[in-house]
Amino acid sequence: MNNLFSAKKLLVVVASCMLSTGALWADVNPKPFVVPELKTWTGAEGQTALSGRIVLKNAKLKAVAEALANDYKTMFGKELTIVSGTAKGGDIVLSLKKDKTLGDEGYSMNIGSAVELSAATEHGLFWATRTLLQVSEQHKDGQLPKGKTVDVPEYKLRGFMIDCGRKYIPMSYLRHLTKIMSYYKMNTLQVHLNDNGFRQYFGNDWLKTQAAFRLECDTYPGLTAKDGSYTKAEFIDLQRLAEQNGVEIIPEIDAPAHSLAFTQYKNELGSKEYGMDHLDLFNPETYKFMDGLWKEYIGGKNPVFRGPRVHIGTDEYSNAKMDVVEKFREYTDHYIKLVESYGKQAVLWGALTHAKGTTPVKNKNVIMDIWYNGYADPVEMKKQGYKLISIPDGLTYIVPAAGYYYDYLNCQYLYEHYTPAVIGNKTFEENDPDIL
């Protein structure tokens, strides 16, 4: 009887504990909705009201603080004052800390009595402010949910390409796009600066087929498109704006295919055998022309292309004969080394399975866009030493009204099934270090 009473008493105590614990956990703040999703979240109870101050622990962080203050005012109409010194309740505190686990882009955010943002780099700290803005957007009263996150990206390169060659995209749109990308911690925008239409839609006449090179050019006056282009000053300013927002612009000059803009300008550069959208790789003038074009944009102390990487194209050249395959490989190797001689890292479209040959093509420290496995088998390219960007055309391309690609992305399918480790019909380990 006493044992039964004791058991009942114990059951009541346990039940009471469970109820009180459940109530306790019910008050813990859930993970905030942030894109990309936060890697970790430890919720706490209650909210923190922002004081309206940003406290700097390092003078180097002034630019990050100013960006946060400007964006906060734009979004919410409220001023944030930037100060240094001792933090008070509700302050946003920015600091740097040595933490190898955070890498270049990771950060921590601790919303307690104050909002503490810290990272190993200014870049990482800037991303922390983007998370703070996203959380604030859901709590416009300034009452932020208490809790802590340590957030580190899974992939180094997060972004996309925009085709400004086939269709002119106004500079105002590109500038706005970098801000949108930054808000979601996307860090790379490849700008495709030249391309052309399909001849069959222009009376099968190469000279009438739409083609454009969108950038101001002094080396070859008249090359720049008449239906929309960017001055060099505008393009430099775009890159500066992107840099301020944590985004790298990778400019692309696509050749030796997709090159009708160049051959319309100088007809003798076009291939009579493979079409005028192909540069003639057996003509020495082709190399002189392209060398001069690249020099204009990556040469000198203050080059037009400011970033560490440039894209040299190499997309979809004919492989009809082995002699042209070897010439294509020679061309590819030449322009990898040319841009490297100016201090740039080369990015290129994967084509070396399609153009399989014996002519060596540099692979060390070279990045390859893998868009279609028939052009470049990702397993083989990884073995050869290339760093890969996963951009499978069947899943990630948008070409409105073309019929052979999507008008819109299948967002639900991508969310449920796609990661960068899936490249066409090949699947790699998640976070493979060779997939950027």
Where are the regions a protein language model picked out?
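Flexible, acidic glycine-rich loops studded with aromatic residues
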Residues: 360-366, 373-436
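Hydrophobic faces of well-ordered beta-strands that scaffold small-molecule active sites
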Residues: 158-162, 189-191, 249-253, 308-312, ...
